[in-house]
């Protein structure tokens, strides 16, 4: 590491010591020491040799370069390349000064200043990255602690589960759940739900869907309207059927037929009666019909009676098949 001059030079080659002047003065008191040679303990290694300059302690032992591949990757870093460029520019500047090349001095100094500014900015960024690395180390340590805690909790849960399995259990009931359901029960339940459900909006608005009015069979609304219209046209017959008056009318007709059979001998008298009945019918048609006392009393009784349940409630929620 001691620079020497060329052998063909007329001057003698003398080694240049890198030891400071104060150290050399202190070494003069020691007769055995040679002031022309530097002390091995005070020798300073080059800052551009990362494999030797990196300190090896417990904190950064993992960051020490171990292989040539790591060294090549280290040399490819932008900051290391800038440092090498800075060193090259300094060597060129020193060579230009030694050779008295004044035309290159200004250009070299400008390049050194720009390279120095870039290195300064990269050093500031390097400090930020170093702080980030410290935070990453802290987070990794915390992650390890949390992982250990989670493993411990899982182990405890597994042990508790095994203890619960060892505990005595209640006897199982012999009653089995009937999984086989009759189709009729499903249909009844579906009929009950159909009154309160409808097709979803996504299905109802699908294209090429057949509307219920275009079905071959009549829709539910048309069936309801038809039944209500038929009931409104035959209201009296339905009321009589519910009240049981049809049997009384049939019995009255049977009695009249028996009376007619007994009076076959009096044909002449019946003809006169028929003629008189026809005359009275003509008079009654010309006059407005007068309500008899029997009819009025009957109507009052019907009004006083409670309304009859005709079982025409098509929307009875208790009915199984009502739509």
Curated annotation (Swiss-Prot):
One GO process term, biological-process aspect: regulation of transcription by RNA polymerase II
Main location (coarse class): nucleus
Q: Which residues form a coiled coil?
A: 79-167
Arranged from A to Z, the UniProt key words for this protein are:
Activator, Coiled coil, Nucleus, Transcription, Transcription regulation
- Cellular component, GO, one term: core mediator complex
**Subcellular location(s) of the protein:** Nucleus
The record's region (Disordered) falls at 1-36, 241-323
Polar residues composition-biased segments = 11-36
**Gene Ontology MF, one:** transcription coregulator activity
Fetch the InterPro entries from UniProt: Mediator_Med4
Here the segments flagged for biased composition (Basic and acidic residues) are 241-262, 282-303
Q: Which domain of life is it from?
A: Eukaryota
> Could you confirm whether the keyword Nucleus appears in this record?
yes
Function comment: Component of the Mediator complex, a coactivator involved in the regulated transcription of nearly all RNA polymerase II-dependent genes. Mediator functions as a bridge to convey information from gene-specific regulatory proteins to the basal RNA polymerase II transcription machinery. Mediator is recruited to promoters by direct interactions with regulatory proteins and serves as a scaffold for the assembly of a functional preinitiation complex with RNA polymerase II and the general transcription factors.
For this chain, the family text in UniProt reads: Belongs to the Mediator complex subunit 4 family.
Its assembly, as annotated, is:
Component of the Mediator complex.
What protein name does the entry list? Mediator of RNA polymerase II transcription subunit 4
Species of provenance: Candida albicans (strain SC5314 / ATCC MYA-2876)
């Amino acid at each position: 590491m001691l620079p020497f001059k060329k052998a063909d030079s007329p001057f003698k080659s003398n080694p240049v010591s890198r030891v400071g002047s104060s150290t050399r003065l202190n070494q003069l008191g020691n007769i055995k020491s040679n002031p022309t040679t530097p002390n091995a303990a005070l020798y300073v290694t080059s800052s551009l040799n990362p494999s030797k300059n990196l300190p090896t302690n417990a904190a950064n032992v993992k960051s020490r370069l171990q292989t040539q591949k790591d060294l090549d990757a280290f040399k490819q870093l932008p900051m290391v390349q800038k440092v090498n460029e800075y060193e090259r520019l300094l060597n060129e500047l020193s060579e230009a000064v030694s050779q008295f090349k004044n035309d290159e001095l200004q250009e070299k100094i400008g390049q050194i200043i720009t390279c120095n500014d870039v290195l300064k900015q990269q050093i500031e960024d390097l400090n930020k990255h170093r702080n980030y690395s410290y935070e990453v180390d802290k987070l990794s340590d915390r992650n390890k602690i949390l992982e250990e805690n989670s493993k411990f909790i899982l182990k405890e849960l597994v042990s508790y589960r095994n203890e619960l399995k060892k505990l005595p259990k209640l006897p199982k009931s012999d009653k089995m759940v009937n999984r086989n359901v009759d189709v009729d029960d499903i249909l009844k339940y579906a009929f009950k739900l159909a009154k309160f459900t409808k097709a979803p909006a996504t299905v109802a608005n699908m294209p090429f869907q057949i509307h219920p009015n275009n079905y071959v069979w009549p829709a539910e609304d048309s069936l309801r309207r038809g039944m209500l219209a038929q009931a409104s046209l035959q209201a009296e017959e339905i009321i009589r059927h519910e009240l049981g008056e049809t049997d009384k009318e049939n019995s009255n007709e049977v009695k009249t037929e028996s009376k007619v059979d007994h009076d076959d001998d009096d044909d002449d008298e019946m003809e006169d009666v028929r003629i008189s009945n026809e005359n009275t019918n003509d008079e009654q048609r010309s006059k407005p019909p007068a309500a008899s006392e029997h009819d009025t009393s009957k109507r009052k009784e019907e009004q006083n009676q409670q309304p009859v349940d005709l079982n025409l409630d098509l929307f009875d929620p208790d009915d199984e098949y009502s739509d």
